[in-house]
């Protein structure tokens, strides 16, 4: 993407404040135009002094002009600051809302730390561009457009020096940008690596402490930081060289203007005031050229950050739901999978032609070896992914034809990892239903057998649970997650290995709460502990993404198939029980 396109797209975000931004820009253009009068007035003062003319009127005019210019600049800058800060805040919340609403598959592919880093850096970069646009960018272009013809009207010979200076600035900037383009892109990649490493290490700090990896991870970060600097230093060297060359060019230009001006004054072709005024013009021009150089540098350094952000934004919009999707309402809970297939591009795992139907209120246990596709199946039901083949119907409606939001309104999920936010117990339970009353929230906690431990806490329901609930035990976290699901009161329930990480005593308490939660709900249970699936109306045995066995618990446990073998291996079913069952059936 060209620098112009990067900049133009950045400015489009200001569209929400068109009127206010336009007024600020116009005010800055007026100030830039008025500034041109300063060297002219100064030249007139010099002429008046050297010619012993009346100086006071011009001095008063110059002073008034300086006061007005200063006050106006402060007011305009204040408004520009407010606009830039306001737009940054709204962009952050808008982009956050779009990103967090994306399917989980998108987040798994993109990476949480990558999206976060891209968003935060882009917001700061855009803030700087917006601020400079309203303060300097356009006014600098206008000032240059006015300064050159005004200077030429005063003296073509001196103006030629300034034009050559402008060309020198342009050539230096172009050469340096071409030399550092790849280097700057490499710098941004290294920044992403550093941020990802820090984020990954901090989020897994308990593992690092457990395995004494603190020094190793710190050493790795230092290595990443050194690579960043190795990529950054050559870029900085080129821009330092550009700054030195620009300074040299402007110094030479001023010396040439002074020499030529002195010669013209001595020959009587110009007055001293004209030369002084022209030197003022030259200083203004050099200042504006420096601003243009800074502007070009700013855009150049922003390019990689903003291109990443634009790619992020575009991928979000590409994955947004079709406008025609409707809402699903009054769900009873009847579910049907019709030849559903799904695969991951970088893995052989997935689902292949899965078909089954569940009546409203039934409980389905999904079992099978690791990697069989159990979690993928329930993720497809919740539209974490969309099927690549076949259909999933809820009450006869294809779920790809309804919005994810309306579908998930009717599904409550209890994960193996409870997934608590670093907020109060009350806030975490209320995630189940927005606007739930205090009474409903407490009733859900009681139904989940969570009220007893909550009441022992000093702050009770206002107790903060810590990051990911680390101030609570595993059983306590899980009961809060169950309370959240009870409060949601959805007709479809998904239990994704909800008790596999609990001890036997805690599991018994949590299971009682889950049994209460399952009543009159269509329930999908993923469990490694096969003792939890005895009460299922249907058992699906998955292997390699296919349903290899399907039926009731008693039916499959006595069929001498894969499920029965798994029960025997886990000690739940003995060979003697299988023989007795076969004898009974034969009789």
UniProtKB/Swiss-Prot annotation:
Membrane topology qualifier: Multi-pass membrane protein
Subunit note: Homodimer.
Question: Which keywords annotate this record?
Answer: ATP-binding, Cell inner membrane, Cell membrane, Membrane, Nucleotide-binding, Sugar transport, Translocase, Transmembrane, Transmembrane helix, Transport
- EC annotation from Swiss-Prot or TrEMBL: 7.5.2.3
Report the top EC class in one word. Answer: translocase
Recall the GO molecular function terms of this protein's record.
ABC-type beta-glucan transporter activity; ABC-type oligopeptide transporter activity; ATP binding; ATP hydrolysis activity
Classification of source organism? Bacteria, Pseudomonadati, Pseudomonadota, Alphaproteobacteria, Hyphomicrobiales
Pfam families attached here?
A: ABC_membrane, ABC_tran
**Domain commentary:** In NdvA the ATP-binding domain (NBD) and the transmembrane domain (TMD) are fused.
User: Per the record, what is one GO cellular component?
Assistant: plasma membrane
Which SMART domains does UniProt cross-reference here?
AAA (SM00382)
In this chain, ATP is annotated as bound at 368-375
Q: Which reaction does it catalyse?
A: [(1->2)-beta-D-glucosyl](n)(in) + ATP + H2O = [(1->2)-beta-D-glucosyl](n)(out) + ADP + phosphate + H(+)
**Coiled-coil annotated residue ranges, if any:** none
Transmembrane segment boundaries: 23-43, 57-77, 126-146, 158-178, 248-268, 272-292
Q: What is this protein called?
A: Beta-(1-->2)glucan export ATP-binding/permease protein NdvA
Quote the CDD domains the UniProt record gives.
ABC_6TM_NdvA_beta-glucan_exporter_like (cd18562), ABCC_Glucan_exporter_like (cd03254)
């Amino acid at each position: 993407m060209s620098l112009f396109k990067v900049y133009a797209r950045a400015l489009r975000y200001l569209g929400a404040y068109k009127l206010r931004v336009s007024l600020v820009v116009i005010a800055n253009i007026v100030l830039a135009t008025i500034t041109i009068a300063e060297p002219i007035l100064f030249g007139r003062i010099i002429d008046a002094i050297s010619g012993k003319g009346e100086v006071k009127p011009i001095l008063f005019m110059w002073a008034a002009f300086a006061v007005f210019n200063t006050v106006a600049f402060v007011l305009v800058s204040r408004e520009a600051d407010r606009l830039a800060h306001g737009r940054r805040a709204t962009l952050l919340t808008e982009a956050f809302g779009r990103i967090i609403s994306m399917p989980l598959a998108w987040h798994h592919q993109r990476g949480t730390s990558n999206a976060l880093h891209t968003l935060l850096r882009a917001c700061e970069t855009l803030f700087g561009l917006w601020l400079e646009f309203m303060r300097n960018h356009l006014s600098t272009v206008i000032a240059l457009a006015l300064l050159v013809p005004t200077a030429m009207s005063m003296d073509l010979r001196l103006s030629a020096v300034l034009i050559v200076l402008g060309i020198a600035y342009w050539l230096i900037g172009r050469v340096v940008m071409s030399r550092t383009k790849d280097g700057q892109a490499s710098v941004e990649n290294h920044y992403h690596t550093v941020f990802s490493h820090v984020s990954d290490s901090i989020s897994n700090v308990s593992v690092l402490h457990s395995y004494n990896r603190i020094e190793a991870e710190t050493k790795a970060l230092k290595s990443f930081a050194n690579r960043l600097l190795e990529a950054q230093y050559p870029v900085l060297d080129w821009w330092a060289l550009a700054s030195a060359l620009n300074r040299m060019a402007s110094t030479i230009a001023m010396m040439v203007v002074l020499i030529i001006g002195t010669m013209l004054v001595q020959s009587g072709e110009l007055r001293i005031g004209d030369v002084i005024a022209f030197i003022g013009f030259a200083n203004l021009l050099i200042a504006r050229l420096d601003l243009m150089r800074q502007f070009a540098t700013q855009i150049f350094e922003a390019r990689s950050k903003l291109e990443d952000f634009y790619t992020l934004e575009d991928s979000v919009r590409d994955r947004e739901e079709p406008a025609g999707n409707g809402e699903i309402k009054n769900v009873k809970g009847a579910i049907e999978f019709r030849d559903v297939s799904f695969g991951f591009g970088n893995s052989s795992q997935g689902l292949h032609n899965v078909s089954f139907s569940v009546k409203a209120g039934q409980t389905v246990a999904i079992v099978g070896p690791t990697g069989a596709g159990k979690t993928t199946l329930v993720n497809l039901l919740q539209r974490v992914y969309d099927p690549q083949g076949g259909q999933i119907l809820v009450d006869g409606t294809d779920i790809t034809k309804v919005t994810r939001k309306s579908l998930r309104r009717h599904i409550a999920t209890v994960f193996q990892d409870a997934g608590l936010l670093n907020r109060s117990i009350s806030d975490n339970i209320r995630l189940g239903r927005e606007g739930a009353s205090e009474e409903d929230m407490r009733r859900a906690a009681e139904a989940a057998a969570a009220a007893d431990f909550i009441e022992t806490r000093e702050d009770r329901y206002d107790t903060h649970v810590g990051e990911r609930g680390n101030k609570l035990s595993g059983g306590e976290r899980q009961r809060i997650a169950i309370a959240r699901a009870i409060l949601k009161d959805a007709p479809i329930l998904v239990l994704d290995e909800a008790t596999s990480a609990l001890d036997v005593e805690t599991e018994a308490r949590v299971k009682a709460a889950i049994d209460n939660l399952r009543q009159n709900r269509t329930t999908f249970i993923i469990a490694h502990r096969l003792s939890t699936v005895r009460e299922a109306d249907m058992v699906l045995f998955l292997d390699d993404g296919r349903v290899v066995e399907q039926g009731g618990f008693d039916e499959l446990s006595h069929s001498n198939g894969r499920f029965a073998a798994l029960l025997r291996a886990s000690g739940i079913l003995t060979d003697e029980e299988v023989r007795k069952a076969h004898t009974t059936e034969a009789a």
